[in-house]
């Protein structure tokens, strides 16, 4: 099969779903490429399948006609707030194709999904559920990369967070908690675990200045 991919939001930030779709189709022996309207559009022969992924609702939709026998749209940008159909399990848990975006030393992924908070500005509770749960081990999307971008909405709320933080510690990679850390769950035990991680970037959610100081106490 000839597979086309469209990152509707642009290529400024790697789309994890597209990287997984690329990895799975390449494993099947399919030809995977970025859809290019100049070369793949009409009157060129249609691609067998084109995936269009849109994360943000404010992103304008793709402006060009899509020349594909089958066109599949996905992402919260198209299906707000439910998020649309999830990826099949065999695709969801495949190692991402980081080469799609030319990524060499950074891993992207989720160890947990869901969040109990239900904040009015956030769709995670509606989309992923009001309970944080483990969905993967680190090895599922990390293979020695120097940096890990962790996209978990609330890893500390997961019952297995101690195990998962231990995996991050053992990796010795720099970790970017890009969705933040819930300051309300900063127990002394959790602070000790976080102090053992090589944290590159973090945001404290639901906090005050005094709570922020606790994160890196010796």
Question: Regions from the language model: what does each represent?
Answer:
Residues 1, 73-112, 122-147:
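N-terminal [4Fe-4S]-dependent radical SAM core
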Residues 1-73, 79-80:
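A short, structured N-terminal alpha-helical element that caps or precedes a catalytic domain
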Residues 1-2, 29, 45-47, 68, ...:
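A general structural motif
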Residues 5, 34-36, 71-75, 108-110, ...:
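A structural signal for short, well-ordered beta-strand segments and their strand-loop junctions
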Residues 5-6, 10, 51-55, 124-218:
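Core AdoMet radical
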Residues 18-22, 61-67, 83-87, 163-168, ...:
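Short, aromatic/basic amphipathic alpha-helical patches
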Residues 25-32, 67-79, 85-90, 169-176, ...:
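Structural alpha-beta junctions
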Residues 116, 120:
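Cys/His/Pro-rich metal-binding microdomains
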């Amino acid at each position: 099969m000839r597979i086309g991919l469209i990152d509707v939001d642009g290529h400024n930030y790697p789309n994890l779903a597209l990287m997984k779709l690329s990895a799975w189709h390449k494993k099947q022996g399919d030809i995977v490429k970025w859809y290019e309207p100049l070369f793949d559009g009409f009157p060129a022969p249609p691609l067998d399948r084109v995936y269009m992924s849109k994360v943000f609702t404010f992103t304008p939709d793709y402006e060009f006609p899509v020349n594909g026998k089958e066109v599949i749209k996905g992402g919260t940008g198209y299906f707000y707030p439910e998020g649309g159909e999830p990826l099949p399990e065999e695709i969801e848990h495949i190692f991402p194709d980081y080469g799609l975006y030319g990524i060499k030393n950074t891993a992207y992924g989720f160890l947990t999904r869901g969040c109990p908070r239900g904040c009015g500005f956030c769709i995670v509770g509606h989309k992923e559920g009001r309970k944080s749960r483990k969905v993967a081990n680190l090895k599922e999307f990390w293979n020695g990369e120097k940096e890990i971008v962790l996209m978990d909405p609330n890893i500390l709320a997961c019952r297995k967070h101690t195990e998962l933080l231990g995996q991050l510690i053992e990796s010795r990679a720099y970790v970017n908690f890009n969705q933040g850390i819930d300051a309300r769950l900063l127990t002394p035990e959790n602070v000790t675990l976080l102090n053992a991680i090589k944290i590159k970037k973090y945001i404290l959610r639901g906090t005050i200045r005094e709570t922020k100081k606790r994160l890196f106490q010796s």
